[in-house]
Amino acid sequence: MAEKEKTYVQDVDRSLYDFRNEEKDAYRVKSGLTSDIVEKISEEKNDPEWMRIFRHKALETYNKMEIPDWGPSIDELDMDNIVTYVRPNTHMSAKWSEVPEDIKDTFEKLGIPQAERKSLAGVGAQYDSELVYHNVREEVAAQGVIYSDLEGAMRGEYGEQYAEMIRTHFMKLVTPGDHKFAALHGAVWSGGSFVYVPKGVSVEIPLQSYFRLNAPGAGQFEHTLIIVDEGASLHFIEGCSAPKYNVANLHAGCVELFVGKNAKLRYSTIENWSKNMYNLNTKRAQIAEGGVMEWVSGSFGSHVSYLYPMTVLKGDNS
């Protein structure tokens, strides 16, 4: 029998992603992880009291847990050298023209505004620890679809019913006790998107959030929470990248997806990380009776990747 020809996979061309901007952040916490740092992040985020308490309890859990030993070694990752919150020198806007030129240039090089115009129902763009742009098409919003920054929704800025949804669902699928970096996420999370698709609504074109980590030696801890109600459907796309530095960067995002009865959700991810990145990501979906969940994931680069996806088939025929 003839020997099968071997196929070799070369490194992905990262020239599109390795450009970097001069650091112009408005505020950053000190490196490391302490109760004071967690409190400062909570103040910066204007958290409701329940979230402030949640963060500190997550920090307590983090301090009690060991580094996971079920994957590649991450012994070289030193949290004392990681900056867990970096606020860019801007605010979130629904108008692309209001985004600062240097940040706008970053996302334009990545093709985000072009993609929004051509084929997306809405876009969120996060730069370091904060969303800088978030917008959804009027016809999608008219269907009752909520696509917003998670923090604003948590504070009730889009309606108290959505604030209550977040309090009911936040880190209930991925709990701080799952593993050490889930606890870390619970303590210092910042940014991310909230999506609610009402009963029976079909979002015909995708929503997308893109996360760009620019600051060297920093971490990014966005949280994505999606609720697709009974009989509804959605395709959500997530993109992530960062330039290459000579110091470690950390990405420990979290995704929680709730798919209702006879609902359908497709979650697509493309991550292209530099070789100095520790990518420690946890994603989980819970599917009700007759619901359908589709994961499409492509993760490239990084120094170490822990990707921890899970689907909980809670209902019959899911």
Predicted regions and their residues:
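N-terminal amphipathic, basic helical "cap/leader" segment at the start of enzyme domains
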Residues: 4-8, 27-178, 182-183
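A composition-driven signal for long, intrinsically disordered, charge-rich low-complexity tracts
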Residues: 1, 62-65, 300, 311-313
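A generic structural signal for ordered alpha-helices
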Residues: 15-20, 29-40, 60, 173, ...
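Conserved beta-strand/loop scaffold segments within soluble protein domains that form the structured core
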Residues: 133-135, 139, 143-147, 151-318
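Intrinsically disordered, low-structural-confidence terminal and linker regions
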Residues: 1-15
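Non-catalytic terminal regions with compositionally biased, polar/charged low complexity
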Residues: 19-22, 45
